[in-house]
Amino acid sequence: MIKILVSNDDGVTAPGIKALSDALSTSYQVMTVGPDRNCSGASNSLTLTNPLRINTLSNGYVSVSGTPTDCVHLAIRELYTDEPDMVVSGINAGANLGDDTLYSGTVAAAMEGRFLGLPAIAISLVGSTLTHYETAAHFACKVIAGLLKKPIAQDQILNINVPDLPIEQVKGIRVTRLGARHKAEGMIRTQDPAGRDIFWLGPPGDEQDASDGTDFHAVTNGYVSVTPLTVDLTAFEQISTMQQWIDKI
């Protein structure tokens, strides 16, 4: 049976990882390993200064005292004797669109799976109330079945964003590019009980590039967005230009 490793960044007890694991377990052998707390915004960070501790929950999920990247690395390298066939990260409670992908622990967990040689996808539910996790799980299963039949390039993952709608109201699936947000709003300054200044990150910026063809545009218009992301960050098209620039300095 096909084995799928499921992880996330919202934490191993979050509703999204349960909805995803439950949906996948009807067709695949599922191994669910997630962080013991909410790690949203953890990106590709690793825990390097503390040991990782694990705890197996009553439902069989494994909780890890680390980041999403830690979870995937530990699961593949140590926790299971049989390597999974695929890594699926999510379902994230909220969008991973445009610039979000740089900070996303959900996307990072999928990236780590791909770094370790496995096909991987990240899936997120986009909306204000976040009630239709079953819709995101449905489309995750659909994409996974397609990947198992026809794999994508080995240096890519798929970043999937699903509108928070009933399944029958989703208009279809669009392959997209990343859009862009305006810069995040400023820091929020407040005081702790002792009167000392403390700071919170401001909310993310509004869409700057949500034109046709972007992930923002697809989801806003009721479509599932599937964006191929490359693990290799090299800007290959700039190498020749950069060499000319270097030669002149």
UniProtKB/Swiss-Prot annotation:
Entry's EC annotation: 3.1.3.5
Record-listed a divalent metal cation binding positions: D9, D10, S40, N92
Cofactor(s) the record lists: a divalent metal cation
Taxonomic superkingdom: Bacteria
Gene, per the UniProt record: surE
InterPro entries recorded: SurE (IPR030048), SurE-like_Pase/nucleotidase (IPR002828), SurE-like_sf (IPR036523)
Biological role stated in the UniProt entry: Nucleotidase that shows phosphatase activity on nucleoside 5'-monophosphates.
Entry's Gene Ontology cellular component terms: cytoplasm
Identification of the protein by name: 5'-nucleotidase SurE
Subcellular location: Cytoplasm
GO MF annotation terms: 3'-nucleotidase activity; 5'-nucleotidase activity; exopolyphosphatase activity; metal ion binding; nucleotide binding
Co-factor binding comment: Binds 1 divalent metal cation per subunit.
Organism for this UniProt entry: Shewanella sediminis (strain HAW-EB3)
Cited SUPFAM superfamilies: SurE-like (SSF64167)
Enzyme class, UniProt record, top EC level: hydrolase
NCBIfam families cross-referenced by the UniProt entry: PRK00346.1-3, PRK00346.1-4, surE
Organism placement in taxonomy: Bacteria, Pseudomonadati, Pseudomonadota, Gammaproteobacteria, Alteromonadales
